[in-house]
């Protein structure tokens, strides 16, 4: 199985829901808080074509899910100057 990357934000309940789902499915993943990690925020924006909504789930360098069940939290990237 390929490694998953979860781009999210601690304050976002939808990130928590995706995290819970991944753990329930026993999937290994690396998580990045894009509000604390400027490099992760930039990478997420590159992968999504500039989208600033979390959570974003990436597998093998490709976005496989954006948002959680049609919902997400907007992040602005200003918290990690």
Q: Which functions belong to the PLM regions below?
A:
Residues 34-50, 77-79:
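Thioredoxin-like thiol-disulfide oxidoreductase module
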Residues 48-58:
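Structural micro-motif
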Residues 1-28:
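Local sequence-structure signature of Cys/Sec-based thiol-disulfide redox active-site neighborhoods
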Residues 13, 36, 64:
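Glycine-/small-residue-rich active-site loops that bind phosphorylated ligands and cofactors
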Residues 59-81:
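Non-catalytic, surface beta->alpha helical segment in thiol-disulfide oxidoreductase systems
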């Amino acid at each position: 199985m390929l490694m998953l990357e979860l781009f999210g934000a601690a304050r976002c309940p939808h990130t928590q829901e995706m995290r819970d789902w991944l753990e329930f499915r026993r999937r290994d993943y690396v998580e990045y808080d894009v509000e604390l990690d400027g490099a992760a925020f930039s990478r997420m924006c590159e992968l999504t074509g500039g989208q600033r909504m979390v959570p974003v789930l990436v597998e093998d360098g490709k976005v496989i899910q954006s948002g959680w069940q049609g919902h997400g939290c907007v992040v602005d990237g200003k918290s990690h100057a």
